[in-house]
Amino acid sequence: MIKKIFSVLLALLITTGVQAASKLDSIKKSGELRVGTTGDWDPMSMKDPKTNKYKGFDIDVMNELAKDLGVKVKFVPAEWKTIVAGITADRYDISTSVTKTPKRAEVAGFTATYYKYATVPLVLKKNLKKFSTWDSLNNSNVTIATTLGTSQEEKAKEFFPKSKLQSVEAPARDFQEVLAGRADGNITSSTEANKLVIKYPQLAIVPDGGKNPAFLAMMVPKGDKVWNDYVSNWIKRKHHLDF
């Protein structure tokens, strides 16, 4: 009887130990923070094709997190259509910023929000008179480009139910379809849109105003409360310090 009780207690202890294991422990032990990033979202994460190095606000954030953890950072190339799968498959410990969505939350954990943006449409500047409002883009004769796997792909279905939706796969981007004349418009974050209209003067933001305020956070493995709490508290502390 005592042997049986001991066996049950031992099994419980082992199970508890497995459940308590956290990415925070493995990161500290390995000395490396693996970060999944797409490298195609200006100004958050961009990969320089000449140097193969990443730059952007998210990259600065991840370098700072690794520094405070006392480990090295390793950026792992990811694509929007598989960025969630990279977390669940343990290809990286954390992602750079993604939009919080219910679909992603089903399989991945989200840290505290660290950035907020609105969604805006982009069109060719020469077509601004024709496409001056959101409603003008919601038409069966209009083609809206989206990038496969992004939150904008889902939003486009909601905002433009009458339009033709044309998805492109990374490394191609939706706005490139607009530039090439293969699509009439696309939607993106107000942050990226402001960068794109400077880089490509032929593009313009539809002056109808932003919609659908969205929140950015990093993705971490679902259920890893220790790691999630660590990063979330770190974000709040850095906000307090105006990082």
Predicted feature descriptions by range:
Residues 21, 71-75, 79-81, 99-104, ...:
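A conserved helix-loop-strand patch within extracytoplasmic ligand-binding domains
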Residues 82-85, 98-106, 154-158, 179-212:
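A ligand-binding cleft/hinge motif common to bilobed small-molecule-binding domains
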Residues 24, 54-58, 105-117, 205-208, ...:
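A structural signal for short loop-to-beta-strand junctions that line the ligand-binding cleft
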Residues 59-60, 74-85, 166-180, 212-214:
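Short helix-initiation/N-cap motifs at beta->coil->alpha
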Residues 116-120, 194-236:
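Periplasmic-binding protein-like
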Residues 59-68, 127, 135, 141, ...:
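Extended ligand-binding regions for polar small-molecule ligands
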Residues 45-51, 62-71, 133-140, 149-168, ...:
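Ligand-binding cleft/hinge of the Venus flytrap
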Residues 22-98, 106:
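Extracytoplasmic small-molecule ligand-binding "clamshell" domains
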